Amino acid sequence: MGPDTSKRRKASDFPQELLDLFHLYVHGEIDRRGFFSGARKFAVGGLTVAGLFEALQPNFAWAEQVPKDDARLKTERVTVPSPQGNGTVGGYLVRPANAAGKLPGILVVHENRGLNPYIEDVARRLGLLGYMAFAPDGTSTVGGYPGDEEKATALFRTVDSAKMTQDFFAAARWLKARPDCTGKIGAVGFCYGGGIVNKLAVELGPDLAAGVAFYGAQPTAPEDIAKIKAPLLLHYAALDAGITGRWPAYETALKAAGATATGYVYEGANHGFHNDTTPRYDEAAAKLAWQRTVDFFNKYVKG
């Protein structure tokens, strides 16, 4: 039995300007006070600014498509060496419980709030599809995900960004080198994690079998893009002007470099449309993007 989503609010329940304002808050471009100030004009008809703020917060129960204790999976917390990063990086490792032989690996990279329950569930979804999924927590060396999104965003900003990037590089290499891995790994990331997937494609070159980036920042230097050898699948939201607006130039650069890349822009969707814990979730776009992701990994990582 899946989560009860009967009371889920949809993006269409909110003015787009309010969703854009919340996007700025989530990404640290404005603080809570700034959000409240900008949201005042929407607090009408009995609505309060505090009520609007609360309605936009994630409900992690909605994201539990695969229970934490699902008997079909083996899960554990592991710590990986990261000598070029923060020394170590902790994470969540998921494997099929009845796996026989080596497994293809998928690195799952979180948004800008660390390893929250939504990303853990994504790892479990991949585990049920026959992958060994590893979801590192970029905030693990400063205490790890604190269980509160606002605190998580603040904690995330305390970690040196260059070292955190190296932590994900180390995690990918660790996953690829595991004796129970086939040596073929892919990576999927969301928001901040989408940007990391693009960076992984540059860093690992042919050692990455496939990369899938959901609304992730793109590299711009031609010498970096020339290093990309992995096939890329890139998902963008039409209403995410900043990130999606840079996709055409990235597409042109990838083609010039001879890279294999496919991008989709999902009409009417907001940044974060795959995250099924918030009102920005777009069910149709999320399901289509996820099926495309699964098919892509099955072709390039499992195949």
Please give the residue ranges for each predicted region.
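Primarily recognizes the serine-hydrolase "nucleophile elbow" in alpha/beta-hydrolase
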Residues: 169-229
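N-terminal cap/lid segment of alpha/beta-hydrolase-fold proteins
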Residues: 64-99
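Cap/lid segment of the alpha/beta-hydrolase catalytic domain
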Residues: 113, 139-162, 272-277
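Short beta-strand/loop motif that positions the catalytic acidic residue
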Residues: 234-236
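Short beta-strand element of the alpha/beta-hydrolase
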Residues: 102-111
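Gly/Ser-rich "nucleophile elbow"/oxyanion-hole loop immediately N-terminal to the catalytic nucleophile
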Residues: 149-188, 302
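N-terminal secretory signal peptides
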Residues: 1-34
